[in-house]
Amino acid sequence: MVNEYFTLHNYGGTLEYYLFELANFSALAFFVVFLYKLNYINSNSLLAWLAIFFTPLIINYFIISPYLFGDQFQYAREAMSLKATGGSIETVESRFGTGNTVTYTAKILGVVPLPNYMTVTSLAFANKFFIFVTFLWLKRFFSNENELLLYFLIPSLILYSSMSLRDTLIIVLSLVFIINLIRDRYVLAAVFLYPLLVLKIQMFAFLFLYFIARLFFRAHKNYYLFTFFVLGLIIGGFIMQEQILAVLNLYRIAFAAENFVAFDGSISYHAWNEYGGGLAEALELSSLGDALFKAILNLPNFFIMPLPWNWSNIFYPLQALESWLLIYLYVRLGMKQNLYKNYEFILLTFILLIGSSIYALLMSNEGTFVRYRFTLFYPFLLGAFYLSSTSHKFLKK
């Protein structure tokens, strides 16, 4: 078979690169125009999504170097290998084993029927497809299509979905999980939760806690059940304190090691193994009280970073402004029709704060955790938007 002789060719920013990706753009453009002709979407959505579908062509190589997000090449190569040979790349399989995040991401993104998967940007168009399908699914819950569309024009969503990364899959799965959980579709919610166990274990943990709180504790019903859940969480935390601290300390040290720079210029884990051993003890959390105290101290920084004194390019102030606006939007949704008094919204926000607090504890590299913050925050923002909808049953109580 010809696929036995598959080798990866990096087309870079050549003419062939743009021809391949224009074909992928054209396929998605045809799909959105077809839906417009069927009157399934309005003219604003047509124009917006055509622009959104075009962004991968102007992000990689044109605006920023794809090597700034080097993971793209790993996912793209794995997808190409799976399609060409039916097997994983040797380095991926030997390094991560079977059923790893890279292979799993490549398999899911690879199911999108695009004309080709020839370059590092091809998977970005698969991400765009999943985002668009999510928009179509959500649209039926809202009377105002244009208002929903605005949430899909958030710059970070456009940016991260314009690259061959797993962030978009995590956002889509988390968002669909949250909406189905709010709608009491527990089995369907569990189906969308399961892939996160491989794609993003931290996100799985946060949302699984939400699942338990709602299904077993019924914490979204009233003050007493919510309080019972919080007390249960505190008691369970102290019972499993050693195990929880072991996991938190492992991740704190791992993130610190990943971003470590030694005095001789060496970086990451190799440098940490040589020079960073003495810093590990300072990073370790001694108790859950210590963890809570440090999380509270770091939480404001986590929500508003990157901070002005760390701005090194034009994207940093834009990301900071976006983070402030998204927080404002979430608060405004909470104030809408006194939603902040509703225990469905209170539970949703409580889980968001738990996830944010844990990330604030683990935070090391700002660039990495700006991505993590958006991946966590955006699904909860859409969940709040769904709850604030005037047609939602919770607002009628």
Question: What label would you give each PLM region?
Answer:
Residues 71-117, 297-298, 302-303:
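Short hydrophobic/aromatic helix or loop-helix immediately within or flanking a transmembrane segment
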